[in-house]
């Protein structure tokens, strides 16, 4: 790095720098001068650049340069020079003026009465389980990605595999197996989907997003999203509001948050531009990414649930999705999504000396067999 000094021309007219050199690496560093002695195998030299060559600075020249840099740094850090009232003031828009600007826009209004789709009391009690909510939030943070073109392809490859702390890894497998046995017995849930199965089945039902966006079908998750928007004083949901939100209400049941995130990205690829242009206040409040992730994705997965259980109406699918969230966060989110993750799971079970019954492959078809048959 190169630092410009404000010293007078007779004191220091050229650019000065401190070079810290060692046998293993060389680099530039700002800061006060250190004594000219060996420091961790490196030697500090006072040099300046003149006509393409390096000359050593005198102590007085270096001190002038160092004092000027220290003065600049102090001025930048002086809190009196920053108007905190202006810099951190809340920008709250007038909702009436917002509605005025949106007059005449294509506003989304659902055709059914949204109030009839409130969550049953049993589901509300389930959502209050702290351990499940904490697990869900950890998984969502672990698999969340930024909104960019490269992130989409990286996420679809599932490059980030789930890694658990060693002291909790075995207990997590034990609890996951117990939850799986409970829900498989009670609900006869289908095997957790692999990535290719998930993408294929999602594309069969992704067009339901059009029906939701035009108000042709009702949506439980849109109704809940609208309630959040109505209770907020802001135009756009904040990170603080997301943290305070009971995110389990927007989790896609037995599919889990990991697979829900992938469906959300598939939806964003297809409907991202349409969501950006939509002037509906609920969509504007949540934004294209979160609206795809927390509203449209669980809605699309609810239609996969209808197929799994051969249901005739979406309301029954919503009930199943709401009551199987624990399976999603404790079983589906820990189950291999891609083929290479199966080997990781098998290695973990061997290391922990857990029998085959704790493997997710004890109830799922192994896709490696299909690959082997295709090769043969």
From Swiss-Prot:
One Gene Ontology term, aspect cellular component: nucleus
Region (Disordered): 50-81
Naturally occurring in which organism (per UniProt): Kluyveromyces lactis (strain ATCC 8585 / CBS 2359 / DSM 70799 / NBRC 1267 / NRRL Y-1140 / WM37)
Its biological purpose: May be involved in a process influencing telomere capping.
Protein's gene: RTC4
Pfam (any one): RTC4
Keywords noted in UniProt: Cytoplasm, Nucleus
Basic and acidic residues bias locations: 64-81
Family designation: Belongs to the RTC4 family.
Protein name per UniProt: Restriction of telomere capping protein 4
Subcellular location: Cytoplasm; Nucleus
